[in-house]
Amino acid sequence: MSNFTVKVPLSERMADVLISKDRWKDDEEGYLKVKYGLEIILINVMKFAIVYGISLATGLLLQTVTVHMSYLWLRRYSFGLHATKTLNCTLISLAMFVLAPFVFQNIPSNNWIVLGTFAFILLNMFLFAPADTESLPLIGEKHRKTLKRKAMIGTLILTGIALLIPFAEMKTLIMVGSLFQVISINPLSYKLLKRRYRNYEKYE
């Protein structure tokens, strides 16, 4: 007899507990879709709790929120790489939203640095946004052009916020979050991680 047992992820076990399979016995496909969606929600909730729990415990909540919101503001339309494993995603999130704010929290920046940095970010948005993934190909040239335009407008808005905000250290944190998003859409990042770039080409 084999002693090998398959280790079921915690999120999957929790989803099984929360969803009654008996209610979906006549719709296996529907059950799997709902279960998968619930797993994604649970994974994100747990990741959020870990990142913000550590941030709160270390007194970095404001810094974490600043970096995270800047990152999400640009990511909304420019998309970009996702980690393929939950553990990797959590570790990367801790590095980006807890460790990086800790390192950069006391480094001030002036508006000339802001302008230079965001000029670089805007160029990357023009060249590379939006960037898709294997699991989320961005199909349709018109759709991609719309996303690119919105990503560039979002970059300009964030530039204005960074220029107007009176706290020099906050300017730095906004730029850090924005640069993380630039890394996630850059073709070099895809190449280094051996991920496929321009996944939409497979469907068009």
From Swiss-Prot:
Record key words, sorted: Cell membrane, Hydrolase, Membrane, Protease, Quorum sensing, Transmembrane, Transmembrane helix
Any one GO BP annotation for this protein: quorum sensing
Main localization (coarse): membrane
Enzyme Commission number, as recorded: 3.4.-.-
InterPro entries to which the protein is assigned, alphabetical: AgrB
HAMAP family xref list: AgrB
Function: May be involved in the proteolytic processing of a quorum sensing system signal molecule precursor.
Name of the molecule in the record: Putative AgrB-like protein
Species of the source: Listeria welshimeri serovar 6b (strain ATCC 35897 / DSM 20650 / CCUG 15529 / CIP 8149 / NCTC 11857 / SLCC 5334 / V8)
